[in-house]
Amino acid sequence: MDRDGRRERPWIMRTYAGHSSPAESNALYRRNLVKGQTGLSVAFDLPTQTGYDPDSPMAAGEVGKVGVPIADLGDMRLLFEGIPLDTMNTSMTINATAMWLYALYAVTAEEQGVDESALQGTTQNDIIKEYLSRGTYIFPPGPSLRLITDMIVHTVEHAPQWNPINICSYHLQEAGATPVQEIAFAMSTAIAVLDSVRDSGAIPAERFGEVVARMSFFVNAGVRFIEEMAKMRAFVQIWDEVTLERYGVTDPKQRRFRYGVQVNSLGLTEVQPENNVQRIVLEMLAVTLSKDARARAIQLPAWNEALGLPRPWDQQWSLRIQQVLAEETDLLEYDDIFAGSHVIEGLVDRLVGQARDEMASIAEMGGAVAAIESGYMKSQLVQAHAERRARVESGEQVIVGVNRHVETEPNPMLADLDAAIQVVDAEVATQAIESVRAWRAQRDESAAQAALERLRADAQADVNLMAASLDCARAGVTTGEWADTLRRIFGEYRAPTGVTASIAAGVASDELSAVREAVQATGAALGTRLRFLVAKPGLDGHSNGAEQIAVRARDAGFEVVYQGIRLTPEQIVAAAVDEDVDVVGISILSGSHRELVPAVVAGLRAAGMNDTVVVVGGIIPDADAEFLRERGVAAVFTPKDYDATAIMGRVLDEVRAARGLASAAR
């Protein structure tokens, strides 16, 4: 308790939400706020995140699927209608287009009569980690760092209560990072950002503490909650050291490690999903038990996220978990209950020492941006993820219901699976397209073009782009127009995949050896080495699964072709034809499989590749899996299919069947 005997204030409670349309998302937000949620966390759809309007060919199949589509100021007005932005704390998970979405938000507040200085919230804006994990980057690292820097400089002056960046270790853990890598990579990114702001000369040295004070972090918390809690204390210690020693920030309040958290969605299972509830609770303890390292904001995933899009009731359940812990227990009545624990202190010391060593290695490479451009960080994550997968497959790392205690009674919550998840209406895309076209038709076109011309000129002149972006928002410019203008100046970027021939992750099982021998025998029978194209169609940048399939396919003896993320069906077909592949493995997590996968299959057949096997992996409901099989997909794999070697065996069987060969003995 505080000195007056009162309980500590709880953290900000959010649920990560947004889908279909601004109007539907607005209704969801208002319902959640009535239920006691104390902040908003906005999920945007992939076209919005990657800078495309709903009517762009690149947006096909993606509109409204994983978040809300925001194409213009009108959409942002609808999203926050009836929600006073002078009192709301809003977190926006947005990166490459963060400057633009913030501009739309600030102008919406302006129209509500709210001064920009009153805004409270966070833009994720950690474009650096997008090259390593989520994949929603647009521009090369240099221009991306400029956008981050420009926004930080602007908000320090004009929105002092806004967190202009959330350095994200969350996605690094999902991409495979160990706790040491999570700390070191995130801290190296923070150093790159702070160095850029300092070196810009836009913030006087005596005010640099204000920059540091608005830096925030977004972290992950896994089920090993003792180690995870020690990780958070290690973050606190290293951040305090870096900001004092490197940047000379003497005010302890400005050096405070401020972070929000979502617990580990990657660890949620499709099999026995009811077990996810206790996983979520245990993971939350990692970021709440230790007062000295407690999260300032928490959002919990829903129990059924491995099955599909959660319903409002599922999100309410996650909110109630937070409320029970904060309001029914005595958690907030005590000082740090782990202070002086030799076990915790030993864990923290080990993590701090190893993280410092890794940070020093990255610094020797030239810092985080250089370590990304060289492929070092990405290859380290792919390697660590492959090792984690190998531990799960061998049973060394236990996942209850998946590789141990698999016997189960029928789950009544899944009796009607279609009702257990929310489905986005197919008309959402049509409505969004009509909306953005109507918006363009009614705006002052000359004002919009003038604003875009200023944006173009400022980008070329190395002027801070925030003012021009605000002008664009007021003039009715669209998301795609803003991003396309900068694409023409900065160019687009394709990040290293991290998939290398040297990665084997210690996998040397009898099962893998048998599959490898069968792959080689099949190739000999067909007179060629079997070729496997791993493909990521659409705008889905979550490449972790695709990378692990590429690694295991190579270990199993296939010649692997993997060109990275964000490909059109036409590009995938062209690659399959050029490389004369035997298998096209499509990885897709955005819910756009019903639109994009049939387009790939049809393209392959039109190109005469009738014997090429198509398999699909992702979060795909049973009804959709049947839909895909009816359209020529040989096999569909979902999160329950955790054994990558078994997947390779099944793929080989499909190849042999397509070529008229009997199943291989293994």
Q: How would you name each of these model-derived features?
A:
Residues 311-312, 316-323, 327-514, 577, ...:
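Flexible, glycine-rich loop/tail regions that form catalytic "lids" or insertion modules at the edges
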Residues 1-228, 246-249, 253-260, 294-301, ...:
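Catalytic alpha/beta active-site cores
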Residues 546-652, 656:
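Cofactor-cradling patches in redox/metallo enzymes
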Residues 60-65, 90, 129-139, 172-176, ...:
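Short beta-alpha connecting loops at secondary-structure transitions
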Residues 652-666:
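The C-terminal output helix
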Residues 5-13, 54-64, 85, 129-135, ...:
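Gly-rich Lys/Arg/Thr-decorated short loops/hinges at beta-loop-alpha junctions or inter-strand turns
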Residues 36, 72, 113, 239, ...:
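Conserved, mostly hydrophobic/aromatic
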Residues 207-211, 249-263, 271-304, 310-331, ...:
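Flexible glycine/proline-rich, aromatic-decorated loop/lid segments
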